[in-house]
Curated annotation (Swiss-Prot):
Organism: Zymomonas mobilis subsp. mobilis (strain ATCC 31821 / ZM4 / CP4)
Cofactor note: Binds 2 magnesium or manganese ions per subunit.
Binding residue positions for Mg(2+) 1: D254, E270
A Pfam family annotated for this UniProt entry: Dala_Dala_lig_N
Protein name per Swiss-Prot or TrEMBL: D-alanine--D-alanine ligase
Length: 321
């Protein structure tokens, strides 16, 4: 019998981010094989508990994106099954995927975030929830799925029509936020360290799903060419958010920075507990800036999960125990 550690790479699933998850998972699996692990790739389905029991992994590498791999569901299952796994636990995952709940925890801790409102989809047919321009997005999705900027040019300033609702047809409740002009920044955190700041410059002016995952659609500038005090603040806020939410392993914090407002123009948009691991992904890119290649990064994530007591859910910072 092999003495290699057995890593199950969990990927796919049925969320809107399935294809990206499959791509992440395949790259991770190949890297972990190069790192010397025995690797099994598992496509998430309704029989996943049975498949995990049969596989008998030493640890699961969670390469899922969206529900149920990013919202605490699969984390809770693996907790019940006493299976070690990478990335954040149940509580941090469930909070971070809910953008409005995340605000309620981070804003009182002096982490600036755009303050919007929850809106029922049907109400959009009669009036705008906020003055234009504003951003409309699902409450519980990642990868910029369903995110749109509603400005004066949208429908000639008139309310959204029913035939324009397709991006949000599967979401009864949406989040509306004031649009923050300026630049798109992102920071990866690994463990207790913020890695770097990347500026994202989409060719079409908006960092949507297509811009994120289509080669050549977005220019990544890493490290970002921004004032040192902005980079320091973004990295400090990212690490603080990671710790307050109780994240472990890698996370990624996304920001908008109004460069005309200086330090006061930096706003955290969301914390992603399952950042992508594709060739275009930001965590591997920032790790590379620090001299950590892709194989080494995947090994670090696995070894952290094996070393920590991930069999008991990570508690949120500030709680006892």
């Amino acid at each position: 019998m092999s003495d290699k550690k057995h890593v199950v790479v969990l990927m796919g699933g049925w969320s809107s981010e399935r294809e990206i998850s499959l791509l992440s998972g395949r790259h991770v699996g190949k890297a972990l094989e190069e790192a010397g692990y025995r690797v099994t790739l598992l496509d998430m389905d309704r029989d996943i508990a049975f498949k995990l029991r049969e596989a008998k992994p030493d640890v699961v590498f969670n390469a899922l994106h969206g529900t149920p791999g990013e919202d605490g569901s699969i984390q809770g299952l693996m907790d019940l099954m006493a299976i070690r796994y990478t990335h954040s636990g149940l509580t941090a995952s469930a909070i971070a995927i809910d953008k409005e709940l995340t605000k309620k925890i981070l804003t009182p801790e002096n982490i600036p975030m755009p303050q919007g409102c929850l809106v029922e989809r049907e109400s959009l047919y009669t009036k705008d929830p906020l003055p234009r321009p504003y951003v409309l997005k699902p409450v519980n999705e990642g990868s910029s799925v369903g995110v749109a900027i509603i400005d004066e040019s949208f429908n000639d300033g008139q309310p959204i029509r029913k035939d324009q609702i397709d991006p949000w047809k599967n979401f009864k409740t949406l989040l509306a936020e004031p649009f923050i002009k300026g630049r798109e920044l992102t920071v990866a955190v690994m463990g207790d360290k913020a890695l770097a700041v990347t500026e994202l410059c989409p060719n079409n002016g908006f960092y949507d799903y297509k811009a994120k995952y289509t080669d050549g659609m977005t220019t990544h500038i890493c490290p970002a060419k921004i004032p040192a005090e902005i980079a320091e603040k973004a990295m400090a806020l990212s690490l603080k958010a990671h710790q307050l939410l109780g994240c472990r392993g890698p996370s990624r914090s996304d920001f908008r920075w109004d460069d005309e407002a200086g330090l006061d123009g930096l706003f955290l948009l969301e914390v992603n507990t399952q950042p992508g691991m594709t060739p275009l992904s930001l965590v591997p890119e920032q790790a590379k800036q620090l001299g950590i290649d892709y194989v080494a990064l995947c090994r670090m994530i696995v070894e952290e999960a094996l070393a920590e007591d991930t069999l008991q859910e990570t508690k949120m910072a500030g709680q006892g125990g």
